[in-house]
Amino acid sequence: MIFNPLEQFRISVLQKLFFGNIDISITNNTIILFVILIGFTFLFYVNYSTNTYIPSKWQYAVENIYLFVLQLFKQQINNIVALKYFPLVLFVFSFILFANLIGLLPYGFTITGHIIFTFQIAFSLFFGITLINFFNNKTEFFNLFVPSGVPKPLIPFLVVIEVVSYLIRPFSLSVRLFANMLAGHTLLNILSAFIFNVFKKYALISFLPLLFIVFIIVLEFCIAIVQAYIFSILTCIYLNDIYNTSH
């Protein structure tokens, strides 16, 4: 049997379902998606429904996530009116974090390792924020594409550059998350297969590569958190354009 490190990213159909001509089959991707949504929703619900004077470990962990994202939000958007968008950023951070971490579990499936999934999230945020920005600011929205203090002859060229850089936001946001998750999990899979072969042939020295793979797992854990953090920061930056349309 040929070893394929990308096998872990294959979407497998578990139950074929059709609604007319529309394929709504249940896949491993679907199952993991529901596990993530139910998991972190249950975690937040239990935390706030069983709130006690002395917080439990779960309460302490969830409250720290909440405060961490709130601090991140306030650092990027210095506008009290914008706090109504904080739940969105908290959801984005929590969802991406859970999606990244669940892929590190045995037999886990990394949905953020698929460009179509990360692009759907990034484009939905980009499209929604753009609409809100346009309806809130009307014609002032277009100030985003006209840098202030620029000589008039250069404005047409800079407008083109600004428009292109604005339109590629969902692509850069989705590719960054997808590429990191794909590369990290592929490397982890390759090293795991290598260590398994070393263990079969040279059991006495197998602890050396084993220590290395433990280091890689810890590194992947950190990358999963960092990618959720970066995704949330960029979401905040895009939201900040609603209240700051001038360069």
From Swiss-Prot:
Pfam families in the record: ATP-synt_A
Keywords recorded for this protein, A-Z: ATP synthesis, CF(0), Hydrogen ion transport, Ion transport, Membrane, Mitochondrion, Mitochondrion inner membrane, Transmembrane, Transmembrane helix, Transport
Stored InterPro entries: ATP_synth_F0_asu, ATP_synth_F0_asu_AS, ATP_synth_F0_asu_bact/mt, F0_ATP_A_sf
GO MF annotations, alphabetized: proton-transporting ATP synthase activity, rotational mechanism
Primary localization: mitochondrion
PROSITE patterns, per the entry: ATPASE_A
Sequence intervals crossing the membrane: 26-46, 85-105, 115-135, 141-161, 178-198, 205-225
Compartments where found: Mitochondrion inner membrane
Topology in membrane: Multi-pass membrane protein
CDD domains: ATP-synt_Fo_a_6
SUPFAM superfamilies: F1F0 ATP synthase subunit A
Gene3D superfamilies: ATP synthase, F0 complex, subunit A
Domain of life: Eukaryota
A GO cellular-component term linked to this record: mitochondrial inner membrane
Subunit and partners: F-type ATPases have 2 components, CF(1) - the catalytic core - and CF(0) - the membrane proton channel. CF(1) has five subunits: alpha(3), beta(3), gamma(1), delta(1), epsilon(1). CF(0) has three main subunits: a, b and c.
Function: Mitochondrial membrane ATP synthase (F(1)F(0) ATP synthase or Complex V) produces ATP from ADP in the presence of a proton gradient across the membrane which is generated by electron transport complexes of the respiratory chain. F-type ATPases consist of two structural domains, F(1) - containing the extramembraneous catalytic core and F(0) - containing the membrane proton channel, linked together by a central stalk and a peripheral stalk. During catalysis, ATP synthesis in the catalytic domain of F(1) is coupled via a rotary mechanism of the central stalk subunits to proton translocation.
Family indicated by similarity: Belongs to the ATPase A chain family.
PANTHER family the record matches: ATP SYNTHASE SUBUNIT A
The protein's name in its UniProt record: ATP synthase subunit a
Source organism: Acanthamoeba castellanii
Lineage start: Eukaryota, Amoebozoa, Discosea, Longamoebia, Centramoebida
Gene: ATP6
